[in-house]
Structures are given as structure tokens and as C-alpha cells.
Amino acid sequence: MSVPTGTKSGFKNKEKPLEVRKSNILAARAVADAIRTSLGPKGMDKMIQTARGQVIISNDGNTILQHMAVMHPAAKMLVDLSASQDSVAGDGTTSVVILAGSLLGAADKLLKKGIHPSIIAENFQKAAQRAAEVVMDMSKPIDLSDRETLIRAASTSLNSKIVSQFSSTLAPMLVDAALQAAKKTPEGGLTLDLNDIRIIKSLGGTIEDTTLANGLVLNNYAVKNAGGPSRMEKAKIGLIQFQLSAPKPDMENHIVVNDYRQMDKILKEERQYILGLAKAIKKSKCNVLLIQKSILRDAVSELALHFLAKLNIMVIKDIERDDIEFISRSTGAKPVADIEAFTEDKLGSCDLVEEVESSGSKTVRFSSREGSNTVSILVRGANDLVIDETERSLHDALCVLRSLFRVPALVPGGGACEVQVAQVIGKESRAMDGASAICYEEFSNAMLVIPTTLAENAGLNPVNVVTELRVRHEKGEVNAGISVRRGTSIMVEEHVIQPALVTTSAITLAAECAKGLLRIDDIAFSR
């Protein structure tokens, strides 16, 4: 039982900060342990059931944590940490949480030795900066025009996912998509905006049937029930956000019809109104019309479809609001909210728009427009669970390529970087004295959690494998890492490589998170 001690300034509970830190460290390490089995090519998947009953199967750290019912504030910091790694590098979301948990475990040992938390936090921060330097010293600069190297980096990311058996098909496709969507920087490098690459999910077929298309692909179909076209060459594309149906009166108004002549008059007026809309669209030289989905009523009436078909205008309806921006970038069409503003200068263009049927589902494909760098990836799969996880896997691999475009340098995977960091930091700790030496030594030991976890998940003996790795690194084999087939091997020869940015950001962010948690000595709840 903690006893408050009386001082001039009042009563102070000396044990409370220790209990708060212990609680924070336990909660954070519990989160890290929960996803530890998901790391690496032999990592296990998690099945998550959301509050709405939706089932998700994934081994992506960020996805698992985002859906986990986490209550403790310190544990929520690790969820945010994974999200930060996802936004910075896109990959390494599991590694960063495991590293943070390991660093907090090391900090717990140091706290028990009586070292002040501020000293631990400061030394961990310095050690992380030194670790990032060690990783960059190990890195190998690459030429972004070297397609084979980019494919190997994308394959390494895909090999730990559900789509690993299809990585030889998907990796080249992703590299082609990234190079097509990339833009040149003033310095002569490349920059990749993932908003220029759209992943469309379509049920049916297998993952192997996933295809890449330059330009735009819509998971919709051309309306043909009124006899409209499903293929249009030299397309002039209009994008509307208003309804092609008769105007409705306000809720409080009503119309009283006394005889058939008045009814005929109303129907004739509606017919003339809709015909006027169709003629205005045709007058602008539009021959492909995209209509945004409406939650209020049908966005387009059967009569409007009939008139548009007679005018030989291809109609694609129920376009999602989220797709509007990508459609505008791909085709050059500007969204129009009123028929008065629907003019020729608002139209986009492309050489060909056609409806394509594959594996029992229909899509509409737009050929790439000159000057546009957008691409679409059509993901196929047997069920929604597979398709959703495939989409997440492709997104992670694209983020790896984006990281390479930002920092064009590769490092060996398989825990090679972490072992090298542990060796260098461990040596430097022996040249120090005082609390810094102990903190650096514990930091170096904490780094070994990644190779240890990889070995455990691959069914290897972690003690033997990590010891062998340390011996090989001591001999100068800095590229030696864990191979799930051979135990230890040279990672570059195994083509297990990843962007330097993924590793450096994981170590830096994990140390920052550990520092933030160590500096907390109380938890207060607001009213």
C-alpha cells in the first residue's frame, strides 16, 4: 500500500508515478505481443470481427490494430504509432509496434535499476539516431530506372502477405503501375502520388486474374436497357452531379388533378423537360455520360435513358462520389452540378470507352488520355475476404515503391539491419560509462526482437539462429539475415530487400513512442 508523504507543498504519493509507468508499459507490451506472431513471411493471419459483424482476415499490423478494441490510453499510442509508420513508409507497421514494445521492456529493466526515466528516454532517442545512421551506411543506392530491383523490393513486401504465391505476377504489375503514375521532380528524381493509382475490387476469378489498365476502369456497366451503346470511339465525356428526371415539388406542396387532360398535360411537360435536358447534353457534343449516384431518388429516369439512347449517348450511372476526383484526373472531365453549366469546355476525352466482361462481371474501361498518368488495377478474387486483403497487400507494396522513390536506397531484410544496429550500438556502449552505457546496451539488445520473432514465426530455434547471425555480422557479413528456408543466409542473394526508409522510420518512430510513454507519470481523466 502506498503511503502519502507530507511536504511543505502538500501531500505527494511517490509510488503513483511508478505504478502509472508500469501500467503503461504493460499495456503497450500487450499490444506488441498480440501482433508479434504476424511478422515475416511465415507470420500468421488474424481474423477480426467488427462491431457490425463484418469479418476481416489480415496480417497487416496497422489493419489489425485499427480494428482492435483497445481501451488503455498507452495502448492507443501504439495504434497511432502503427498508423504513423503506415503514412510515412506504408510498410513495417508490425515491426514498429514490436520494436516499441521491446524498447519499453528494456526501459522497464532500466527503471528497476533506478535509472531516471528522462535519462532512459534521452539515451534511447540518441541511440535511435545512431541506429538510423548505421542503417543508411548499410544501404545501397539504386537507380529508379532499374525495373528488376524495384520488382524484388515489391516482391519482398508481398511475400509476407496472403498473396505471396502470386508475387511473381503481381510485383511486375505494381512496378509498371508505379512507373506509369510517377512524376519527375525538378531535381531529376521521381515522386509517386498513390491517388493516381486506383485499386478496383471485382468479385470472381482468382488473384491471378488481377489486371493492370492504363487510364480509368469503373466497376459499373453501360446502361443498355433503353438500347444505348456500350462502346464509344473518340469519346467526349461528361460528368454530371444532377438528376436527369422530372423535377419534384417540395414536401409541403401537392398537385390536384381533376381529369385526364390535366394528367396528360403534366406528363407532356415532364417529357418536354427531360427531352430539353437530353438535347442540352447532346448540344455540348457529349457522347459518354457519367451520372453520380444519388441517395434521394433515381439519378436518371427511364424516359431520360430512352432519349439519351436515341441520341446515341453512352450512359454509365451510379458513379460513387469518392470516384469523382480520380475520373476528373483521368479523363479531364469537370463535374457539373447544373444543366446550365454543362458546356463543351467541361467535357473530358479519350480514344475509346467500352464495356468489358471478364469472369462473369462487367467493367467499363477508358483508354489512357495523353498527358494523364493515372492507372487502374482491377483486383479479382473468390470472395470479399480475399479481395480486401489483396487490396491491402497491393497498397503496402505500392507504399514500398513510393518509399524508394523518396529515398532511393535499399537495405537487406530478414532482420539483418537490426542485428547490425545491435552490434554497432553494443560496441559503442562498451566505450561509454555511467547510465548511458547501460541504456545503449539495453537498446542494442531490444533491437534483436525482430530477428528473434522472425526465427520463432518460421519455426526455427531463435537462440541458435540469432547467435549465428551475430557471429556472421562480427565477421563483417553485414547482409546476413534470417532465411525461412536455410536459417541464415545473405539477404541480397536471396533477393530479400526493402527500402531504407521503412527501417529507419520504424526505429526512429518506435524510440519516439517509447520516449513519450516513459515521460508520463500520471493519468488524469477529464470531466
Swiss-Prot record:
Gene3D superfamilies: GroEL, GroEL-like equatorial domain, TCP-1-like chaperonin intermediate domain. It holds the Pfam family Cpn60_TCP1. It is found in: Cytoplasm. Keywords: ATP-binding, Chaperone, Cytoplasm, Nucleotide-binding. GO terms for molecular function: ATP binding; ATP hydrolysis activity; ATP-dependent protein folding chaperone; unfolded protein binding. One of its GO terms (biological process) is protein folding. The keyword Cytoplasm applies. GO terms for cellular component: chaperonin-containing T-complex. Heterooligomeric complex of about 850 to 900 kDa that forms two stacked rings, 12 to 16 nm in diameter. Molecular chaperone; assists the folding of proteins upon ATP hydrolysis. Known to play a role, in vitro, in the folding of actin and tubulin. PANTHER family: CHAPERONIN (PTHR11353). Belongs to the TCP-1 chaperonin family. This is T-complex protein 1 subunit delta. It comes from Yarrowia lipolytica (strain CLIB 122 / E 150) (Yeast). The lineage of its organism: Eukaryota, Fungi, Dikarya, Ascomycota, Saccharomycotina. The gene is CCT4.
